[in-house]
Every structure is written in C-alpha cells, then in structure tokens.
Amino acid sequence: MQQKLENIKFVITDVDGVLTDGQLHYDANGEAIKSFHVRDGLGIKMLMDADIQVAVLSGRDSPILRRRIADLGIKLFFLGKLEKETACFDLMKQAGVTAEQTAYIGDDSVDLPAFAACGTSFAVADAPIYVKNAVDHVLSTHGGKGAFREMSDMILQAQGKSSVFDTAQGFLKSVKSMGQ
C-alpha cells in the first residue's frame, strides 16, 4: 500500500456518504440540505497545496454541492453522473494522470466501477461489506465524519509531506485562503 500511496497525484471523491454522512434533509422549499465536515475540506485543501489534484464525482447535482466545490477551489468535477467508470477515465485524462496515479474514495455500489478504474481505492468505515471487500483500504472513519481527511493524511504521510498537516506553518498555509 505504501508504494501505491507514494504514486498518487490525483484523488477522485464521491460526495454522498463520503464528504457527507449520506443523509438528505429537505427545507420547507424542498431543497436538499447537506452538511460537510470541516476536516474533509481541510484534507482536500492540504492535498491541493501539496500538488495533488482533487476531483468530485457525484451521482447528484445540487446548488449546495456546487457551492462547496467552489469554496474549496476544486476545478475538476462531474455532477449528476451515475456511470462512474467512464467519468473516472475522463477526469484522469483532464488531470493528465494515469490510473496508477489516481485514488478513489467511495461508499456504495455505484462506486464499484470507479474502484476498478483507479489504481488505489478507499472505502469509508460505514460502507457495506461488499464495498469494503472491493477496495485496497477500508478507512476507520465514517463518511461525513472526516473519512476523506483520514485518507488525505495517509497519502501525504506516505509522500513525506506530513508537514502540511502536522505543523502549525503547514496548517496555516492550507487554511489561509479557505473557508473550510
């Protein structure tokens, strides 16, 4: 696993069940409300500060998700896309990386083709067993509770870039221009 982590230059993440806890709440106008964990936002920003590109690939599209993507400065994304294998290959092409340089993090059946398309795969702790059986690494953190951050720390540690998250200077650099 260490060798795989050292080679990662691109991370593709699912949203519902990974960056959120997977629950959908609706306001009085019928608009979906989601919550995102601040640690995951920091993990995304830290990867980008360490020259590791991050993309979002979601089966859903919503104004709140587009806002989160914009807030984090993510440039590559596909929203409302359930066929994730082709989407992963398209994102890799846009990022200029190979499958071996790409990691994917997901939580459910819809992510199985993406796991197969990418060189390294992660599942959140609360993913179903058949999803856990399909990935390279099962995280100890649940989706929406900092699972992305757990993965990003692993990648940065493996690449000798842990100063991005384990020093005050690295942390301050990452949050300087971000609303988390």
Curated annotation (Swiss-Prot):
Substrate binds at residues 16, 37-41, 45, 60, 68, 84. The keyword Lyase does not apply. Keywords: Hydrolase, Lipopolysaccharide biosynthesis, Magnesium, Metal-binding. GO terms for biological process: lipopolysaccharide biosynthetic process. It catalyses: 3-deoxy-alpha-D-manno-2-octulosonate-8-phosphate + H2O = 3-deoxy-alpha-D-manno-oct-2-ulosonate + phosphate. Its EC number is 3.1.3.45. InterPro entries: CMP-NeuNAc_synthase (IPR050793), HAD-like_sf (IPR036412), HAD-SF_hydro_IIIA (IPR006549), HAD_sf (IPR023214), KdsC_fam (IPR010023). Pfam families: Hydrolase_3. Mg(2+) binds at residues 14, 16, 107. It comes from the Bacteria. It is an enzyme of class 3 (hydrolase). GO terms for molecular function: 3-deoxy-manno-octulosonate-8-phosphatase activity; metal ion binding. Its cofactor is Mg(2+). The keyword Cell wall biogenesis/degradation does not apply. CDD domains: HAD_KDO-like. Catalyzes the hydrolysis of 3-deoxy-D-manno-octulosonate 8-phosphate (KDO 8-P) to 3-deoxy-D-manno-octulosonate (KDO) and inorganic phosphate. Belongs to the KdsC family. Homotetramer. NCBIfam families: HAD-SF-IIIA (TIGR01662), KdsC-phosphatas (TIGR01670). Cobalt was used in the crystallography experiment but magnesium is likely to be the physiological metal. This is 3-deoxy-D-manno-octulosonate 8-phosphate phosphatase KdsC.
